[in-house]
Amino acid sequence: AKFCGNQYSDREWLIAPIRDHGFLWATNAEILVCVPDDPNVSAKDGCPANLIKFHEWFKLAGNFNKINAEAIPKAKRCPSCNGSGIWPAFGDDPEETCQECNGSGEYKNQEVSVGAQHISRWYLALIASLENAQLSCSSDAPTAPMFFKFEGGWGCVMPIKPRSKS
């Protein structure tokens, strides 16, 4: 579920894993993970054709490098909740989980450079937490999906456009 959309997603089909073509797919439209099907996992049947294309593209990816988790910068605090993960009560409304960081308290759009591409620090740390995670970066297409593989599966994450340094 950590790779699926959350309850605030405007695309309901992203909230739970999807079962199709012998795989379980989980995505929030920014990151995608694919593992062999497991009948014990609750999932929706059928997935959009564009997800299947990612499997073909993954087969073309190369130059996978192990992710050095210790080299990932420390997370900055989410500016929306000041790192608490909670939006405070306002008027008669109760406290609720911060929609920006999904309760983690971490700034999700903190930019990290990986070769010629840039990725959200939050996603890089999430990928690095997977067993034997390796990342493939494109040196000539900075906005191309970044593919990764790990023990038992593979995935891709969309890079972020570098912010101008002014």
Language-model features, listed with the residues they occupy:
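C-terminal functional regions that serve as terminal interaction/effector modules
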Residues: T27-S166
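Intrinsically disordered, low-complexity linker/loop segments enriched in Gly/Pro
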Residues: A1-V35
